[in-house]
Amino acid sequence: MTDIEKFHDTIAALESGKVRVAEKVDGEWKVNSWVKEVILSGFRLGKLTDMTQGQFSFFDKDTIPTRTFTAENGVRIVPGGSSVRAGAYLAPSVIMMPPAHVNIGAYVDEGTMIDSHALVGSCAQVGKHVHLSAASQLGGVLEPVGALPVIIEDNVFIGGNCGIYEGTIVKENAVIGTGVIINASTAIFDATTGEYIRANENGQIVVPSGAVVVAGSRPVSKGPGAEQGIHLYCPVIVKYRDEKTSGSITLEDMLR
């Protein structure tokens, strides 16, 4: 099999959901680095081509066009400028509000809502019944090939204008409040325990299951910043999901 044949076969397997960039094995997320390697080969093997559509001019590698869908796919893509790149999987009952973008290698499971101006970055893994609110972004992680992508587990609610980057894992049932930014260097303060959650040995921040995270700050501990009362941004876990929190999210789902 030639490199280009392997690439096209892998893209087809990604789009069908049979192959994933990352998957849960015995309760732990593992990256399939060979899939990333094949995806990256597509940029090397492809040739820049004219992909102009009507009055809109586009130019990209011919190996990585946008995906096309039919009604039989069961994916609701509302008109208005959304795009899904080749090699991305969208399960039946996924909803995309315009404009939104899902990049190569991403996996979006059933019942998930991708709201307007949202981004599902390259290789990001999104579980079932996730709500990705307007203008929120899940960062892409193609390199290094051994690094886990951003992972959002089942039943997570992500508020508007959030940014989840650098291989962050958000465990099931968590709620990320409006405007929260999380990356590998972000320490999260758990107000229920008084402890900070920092990146693990793999360089990843893991948001615990059911955590309700809001934007907050922490004081600079020393130097001129401390003298001036300067604070640094810090996400804060204010509580863990309860019936009241779940009730408000259920109402949001009903209003879709």
Feature names for model-found ranges:
Residues 71, 76-225, 237:
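Structural signal for interior beta-strand "rungs" in well-ordered beta-sheet cores
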Residues 1-75, 204-205, 209-211, 215-256:
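Terminal amphipathic alpha-helical/low-complexity segments used for targeting or macromolecular assembly
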